[in-house]
């Protein structure tokens, strides 16, 4: 059984406004992709498994449901918000953190994520072997 509903007018208006901003201010998109490339490079260089992500939304593969919850909580205590994705949303051995990059992020903020993950890796193994 499938249920479909049209988006609410305020959602449609928000989407249209976002598209208008993107069209009028291409520097925002450029900054988003610069930040995306920066974080992808840093995560890969540091040895974290991010799969084949090509978007500003990165999976950081943890592959253990319990570890995902622990790491997300540790990051939150450091002021870094991530989303844990675990079974049944993904296969049992594909548990991950989801990190979203924004155009408004500064490199220092992205570096703070890397530093926090490196600190956590000392206690909970999360880097690729």
Question: What would you call each of these model-derived segments?
Answer:
Residues 6, 83-88:
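Beta-strand->loop->alpha-helix junctions that form or flank phosphate-binding loops
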């Amino acid at each position: 059984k499938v249920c479909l509903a049209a988006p609410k007018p305020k959602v449609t208006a928000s989407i249209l406004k976002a598209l208008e901003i993107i069209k009028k201010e291409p520097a925002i998109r450029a900054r988003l992709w610069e930040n995306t490339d920066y974080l992808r490079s840093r995560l890969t260089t540091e040895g974290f498994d991010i799969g084949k992500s090509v978007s500003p939304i990165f999976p950081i593969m943890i592959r253990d449901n319990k570890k995902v919850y622990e790491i997300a909580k540790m990051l939150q205590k450091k002021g870094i918000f991530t989303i844990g994705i675990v079974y049944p949303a993904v296969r049992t051995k594909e548990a991950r953190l989801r990190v979203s990059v924004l155009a408004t992020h500064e490199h220092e903020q992205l570096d703070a994520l890397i530093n926090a993950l490196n600190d956590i890796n000392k206690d909970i193994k999360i880097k690729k072997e």
